[in-house]
């Protein structure tokens, strides 16, 4: 194409020619482009970041991009797809086989963001050691950690588990009952932990929690721990376990537990299921009393 042009109005004046038909050339707008040299200068940095954080990129792809695509295509959430797999591959009434089936599905099919077998062994061992009469779990999710706790409870033990999302809670309820645990042993409460904790004593006859598992949103851990303290639900010697304290992390919760003087703290270092290079951990707190 030619250079853009337009007519210029005539210039009147004595001794000047008529320029009414003169053409005025207008330069074409320049499009800003990055110099190839600058782009090449950034290439080593980009490659370094991709290599260093490749595990996080893989996790992002599996937990966000692929999961969202499958949600749209199937019309089901990942927890619902996982339960459908369990129904066709696991043995009803066998919680151990159900847990193994979930692990297999998460590693071979779709990443479930569950506790996984390594953390699961830590959780079961601590429940067996403490032999709590009553356990409170905040964050049921699909019911994986719920089954771990229920398997390790002493005879007559009771587990209350709280899940804020009704649709996720419906899946967890079916999984718990499929494993063979009735409502007298494992009771699932649908609601936010912030609303449920103040009602535990009056509505659910929970006067004390010998062991608490925090497995919901790490940013809510500190708030919920202080709510448990405020409502006197933690007896002296109670154990509080908190998952995901390193990834995505709960720094304010850990700082409070270490500095308030009411807890003895220990950290069990682990990795994420299927992503062992991404470091995480379970915090174990032992409550000394109100002080």
Swiss-Prot record:
Reactions this protein catalyses: a catechol + S-adenosyl-L-methionine = a guaiacol + S-adenosyl-L-homocysteine + H(+)
Keywords from the named record: Catecholamine metabolism, Cytoplasm, Deafness, Disease variant, Endoplasmic reticulum, Hearing, Membrane, Methyltransferase, Neurotransmitter degradation, Non-syndromic deafness, S-adenosyl-L-methionine, Transferase, Transmembrane, Transmembrane helix
Top EC category: transferase
Membrane-spanning segments: 31-51
Disease: Deafness, autosomal recessive, 63: A form of non-syndromic sensorineural hearing loss. Sensorineural deafness results from damage to the neural receptors of the inner ear, the nerve pathways to the brain, or the area of the brain that receives sound information.
Summary of the function given for this chain in its UniProt record: Catalyzes the O-methylation, and thereby the inactivation, of catecholamine neurotransmitters and catechol hormones. Required for auditory function. Component of the cochlear hair cell's mechanotransduction (MET) machinery. Involved in the assembly of the asymmetric tip-link MET complex. Required for transportation of TMC1 and TMC2 proteins into the mechanically sensitive stereocilia of the hair cells. The function in MET is independent of the enzymatic activity.
Family under the similarity heading: Belongs to the class I-like SAM-binding methyltransferase superfamily. Cation-dependent O-methyltransferase family.
Protein name according to UniProt: Transmembrane O-methyltransferase
Lineage, top ranks: Eukaryota, Metazoa, Chordata, Craniata, Vertebrata
């Amino acid at each position: 194409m030619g250079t853009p042009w337009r007519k210029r109005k005539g210039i009147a004046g004595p001794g000047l020619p008529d320029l009414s038909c003169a053409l005025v050339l207008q330069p074409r707008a320049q499009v800003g482009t990055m110099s190839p040299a600058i782009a090449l200068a950034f290439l080593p940095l980009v490659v370094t970041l991709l290599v260093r954080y490749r595990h996080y990129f893989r996790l992002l792809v599996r937990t966000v991009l692929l999961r969202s695509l499958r949600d749209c295509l199937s019309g089901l959430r990942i927890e619902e797809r996982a339960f459908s797999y369990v129904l066709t591959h696991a043995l009803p009434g066998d919680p151990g086989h159900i847990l193994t089936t979930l692990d297999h599905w998460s590693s071979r099919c779709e990443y479930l963001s569950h506790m996984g077998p390594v953390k699961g062994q830590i959780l079961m061992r601590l429940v067996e050691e403490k032999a709590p009469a009553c356990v409170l779990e905040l964050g049921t999710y699909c019911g994986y950690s719920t089954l771990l706790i229920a398997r390790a409870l002493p005879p007559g033990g009771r587990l209350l588990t709280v899940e804020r999302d009704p649709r996720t809670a419906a899946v967890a309820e079916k999984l718990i009952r499929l494993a063979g645990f009735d409502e007298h042993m494992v009771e699932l409460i649908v609601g936010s932990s912030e609303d449920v904790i103040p009602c535990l004593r009056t509505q659910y006859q929970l006067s004390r929690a010998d062991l608490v598992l925090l497995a919901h949103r790490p940013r809510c851990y500190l708030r919920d721990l202080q709510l448990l303290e405020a409502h006197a639900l933690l007896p002296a010697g109670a154990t509080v376990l908190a998952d995901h304290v390193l990834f995505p992390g709960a720094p304010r919760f850990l700082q409070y537990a270490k500095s308030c003087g009411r807890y003895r703290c220990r950290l069990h270092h682990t990795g994420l299921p299927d992503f062992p290079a991404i470091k995480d951990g379970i915090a174990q707190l032992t409550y000394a009393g109100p002080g």
